[in-house]
Each structure stands twice: as C-alpha cells, then as structure tokens.
Amino acid sequence: MANVAGESAETVSTQMTAVWNNFDDGSKSLEYYADVMTALGAATASSTAEISEGLQKFASVAETVGLSYEYATSALATITATTRESASVVGTALKTLFARIQGLQLGETLEDGVDLNKYSEALDKIGVSIFEANGEMKAMDDILDETAAKWDTMAKAE
C-alpha cells in the first residue's frame, strides 16, 4: 500500500494499525483493509492517506454504533471527495455525528432536546424502523441500507 499511496512504510503502518485496532473482527486480512482504501481512493477524488486520517478520528465510535469498515470508509471517501474538506474535518464531523447517535442509543437526550424517539419517528415516516423486533437498535449499516432504499421515494422536505 505504501507504494500505491505514495506514503512511507512507517506512515502506512500507523494508519493500518488504527484501522486494524478498530475494525478487525478476525474475518478479514490487513490486505483487505488496504485494498478497500486503495480502491476507494482511486474511485473518488480522495487518497488512502485522507481516508485513513479521517478514519483515525471516528473509527472507534463508528464501530460502536454498528457501522462497518466498508460503510465508514465509503462515507469518509465520498464526503471528502465531494466537499474537499480535509479528512481531519470530515472525520471529526463523523465522530460527532456517531457519538450523538451512540448517546441516543444509551438513552441520552441531547442539548437541543432531541432523543432517539425523534429520530425513530422521522425515519418511521419514510418506512424505516431503527429497531429490531426484540427492541434493540439495528446496526447503523442496516439503517443506512433501508434509508437508501427509500431515498428515491422521498420528497425534498423529508
């Protein structure tokens, strides 16, 4: 990956250690994680260095709310490529977003009065439930998949 990314082996090692520590569940190799970043960097106007820098900002929170490595890297690469904000800024924004969701999962009410019920009600209006049949909150990947499936049917105000 160092050759493809144009980074030093030391830099890539640090980046991949952060990814490995937060996303590894034993089912994928380190090469897989590197390949995903390299492919996303090539497919978007972002680099593997940007993707890994941003991931270091929010990976631990993303994993906690059930956001997979694939979704996390895709979101980061897409937002970075689209906005051209620095990966650090995008990563911090995603960390804040997912930390808020994590707090809502734990039953907190945010400073603006928003609680999980308000998010749940908004998504219910478009036919997306954030809860499993047993009352547990679904993984973020599943919520995003269901929301994406409804995207074309939503009005602009939604």
Predicted regions and their residues:
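Amphipathic alpha-helical interface segments used for oligomerization, scaffolding
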Residues: M1-E158
